[in-house]
Amino acid sequence: MTRPRLPLMRAATRLAALALATAGVLLTVATPASAAVPTGRYVALGDSYTSGPLIPTQVDLNCLRSNRNYPSLVAASAGSSSFADVSCSGATTDDILYGGDGALGITLPPQLNAVTSNTSLVTVQIGGNDIGFSGIIGDCAEASVSSPLGSPCKNRYTAGGVDQLQARIAAATPKVTAVLQAVRRAAPSARVVVLGYPAILPDTGYGCWPVVPIAYQDVPYLRGIEKSLNAMLANVASANGATYADVYTPSIGRDACKSSGTRWVEGLVPQNSAAPFHPNARGEQGMATALLARLNS
């Protein structure tokens, strides 16, 4: 199915218009230690948090995919007999099930096509774009300029007494369910692991405006939205016989407000090679370590 997607680079350009400069630092990332994980065919499905946009080395410009993202690190550590990383920046659940267009406008088949009957491990990290992640960040960053101490973003998304973002999470639930059920049909014997999302904002307090341009009173609100999304993913995984890998907890204290040498997720102006508000190489390493630990538990 060819359809318009929310191009990550368009969203990044919108955010970058708020910034005065950018900086990039190439990280050296160590491969995680070996773990007792499935060593057969491994297929990685997901969005930009999986693909690793702008993290060197980019091996697929249509999907902005790095060969140092967490699936690549896990596959190397596990010694997977074959490996297919079909994650793609901007992907939604529809892209997994039906296909869509990449960042360069090149049409892609369904990510699900990579899952074969002999697949032994499938990882899935999806849902952020189903709720409109890039648009939310852009809206909230722009709104913060006029009310940095207030809650302009929360006010917008809860106007009329209905939390639109919680409603989006609820609407995404059956879509994630459909993905997991399709994966199970395609690979009945595979171990399926659903990953949540790492901390973008501090786990406590009111953030670090203007370094991360989210208004102070909006930080607790958006933090709660991310936790609700992760909780939904955990619940759907459990209900469909999949394992949930928590990457939020190990990322606490490594959010976008932290120093460039500590953070897993970049802010508006990346100080490490990564897209704005996306994991850097350290974040991909951290998610790989968390995934391996979960597989070995």
Listing of model-derived features with the role each one plays in the protein:
Residues 1-35:
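Secretory targeting and sorting signals
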Residues 31-41, 106-123, 176-191, 292:
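Short amphipathic alpha-helices and their capping/turn segments at secondary-structure boundaries
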Residues 35-90, 141-147:
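Serine-esterase "nucleophile elbow" of acetyl-processing enzymes
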Residues 41-46, 50-51, 82-87, 120-125, ...:
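Structural recognition of the beta-strand scaffold that forms the well-ordered cores
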Residues 53-55, 105-167, 199:
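Oxyanion-hole/transition-state-stabilizing segment in secreted/luminal serine hydrolases
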Residues 90-109, 256-271:
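Charged, often glycine-rich, active-site loop that binds/positions anionic groups
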Residues 121-124, 147-184, 193, 197-244:
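Conserved N-terminal glycine/acidic-rich loop preference
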